[in-house]
């Protein structure tokens, strides 16, 4: 994987080793993003025409190009590790050894089964070892992995593994609560249910007190 940051390469390798990487085929050839957009727009044009939509209408004529740009630059940008966030780690000179929690991180992803929205929030916690991470970097890591076709269970574990790898500690916990529009907008059409997934590592798994402290933070209980 050329031209990747050290952190991006480490995270990718860790996910592959654990069988947690998003299913990706080896590229047939190297395509730049503009070529990808052009090809996607062409296929989207065919799909819309098969749906009997009139692409000569001024409301629809740019839709294939808008969708292609959205896929490559926005909602599926996390498929490209060149977009992995720049990571800031700080030596833990303060000797912080208590739980650090970032709660209610906005999360918007896409269901890989139907390509419709997953909308929710994530809570991430870790117990520092040798390093602490810039807080906004946790949000960016969540968003990076959300910007892929996903299943929520894998997304939760990808975030956990990425942070364990970068921070050099197993003491990480991730919880995601989300609404799946493949459930809300089609099929069963259940507008009120939500899905919660949790992935725990290190003390968050082995220590009942640490686990309960994290779960109280997830539930916003004092």
Curated annotation (Swiss-Prot):
Pathway: Cofactor biosynthesis; 7,8-dihydroneopterin triphosphate biosynthesis; 7,8-dihydroneopterin triphosphate from GTP: step 1/1. Gene3D superfamilies: 1.10.286.10, 3.30.1130.10. GO terms for biological process: one-carbon metabolic process; tetrahydrobiopterin biosynthetic process; tetrahydrofolate biosynthetic process. It is an enzyme of class 3 (hydrolase). GO terms for molecular function: GTP binding; GTP cyclohydrolase I activity; zinc ion binding. Zn(2+) binds at residues 111, 114, 182. Keywords: Allosteric enzyme, GTP-binding, Hydrolase, Metal-binding, Nucleotide-binding, One-carbon metabolism, Zinc. One of its GO terms (cellular component) is cytoplasm. Its EC number is 3.5.4.16. Allosteric enzyme. Activity is modulated by K(+), divalent cations, UTP, and tetrahydrobiopterin. Tetrahydrobiopterin is an inhibitor of this enzyme. It holds the Pfam family GTP_cyclohydroI. NCBIfam families: folE (TIGR00063), PRK09347.1-1 (NF006824), PRK09347.1-2 (NF006825), PRK09347.1-3 (NF006826). Toroid-shaped homodecamer, composed of two pentamers of five dimers. Belongs to the GTP cyclohydrolase I family. This is GTP cyclohydrolase 1. It comes from Salmonella typhimurium (strain LT2 / SGSC1412 / ATCC 700720).
């Amino acid at each position: 994987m050329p031209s990747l940051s050290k952190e991006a390469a480490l995270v990718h390798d860790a996910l592959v080793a654990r069988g947690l990487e998003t299913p990706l085929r080896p590229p047939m050839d190297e395509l730049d993003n503009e070529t990808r957009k052009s090809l996607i727009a062409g296929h989207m044009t065919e799909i819309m025409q098969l749906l009997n939509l009139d692409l000569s209408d001024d409301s629809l004529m740019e839709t294939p190009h808008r969708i292609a740009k959205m896929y490559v630059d926005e909602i599926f940008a996390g498929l490209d590790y060149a977009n992995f966030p720049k990571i800031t780690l700080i030596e833990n000179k303060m000797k912080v050894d208590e739980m650090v929690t970032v709660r209610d991180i906005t999360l918007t992803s896409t269901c890989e089964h139907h390509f419709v929205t997953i909308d929710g929030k994530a809570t991430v916690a870790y117990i520092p070892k040798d390093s602490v991470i810039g807080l906004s970097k946790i949000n960016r890591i969540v968003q990076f992995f959300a910007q892929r076709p996903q299943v929520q269970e894998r997304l939760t574990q990808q975030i956990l593994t990425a942070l364990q790898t970068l921070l050099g500690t197993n003491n990480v916990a991730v919880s995601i609560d989300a609404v799946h529009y493949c459930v809300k907008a089609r099929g069963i059409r259940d507008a009120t249910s939500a899905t919660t997934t949790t992935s725990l590592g290190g003390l968050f798994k082995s220590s009942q007190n640490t686990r309960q402290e994290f779960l109280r933070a997830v539930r916003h209980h004092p």
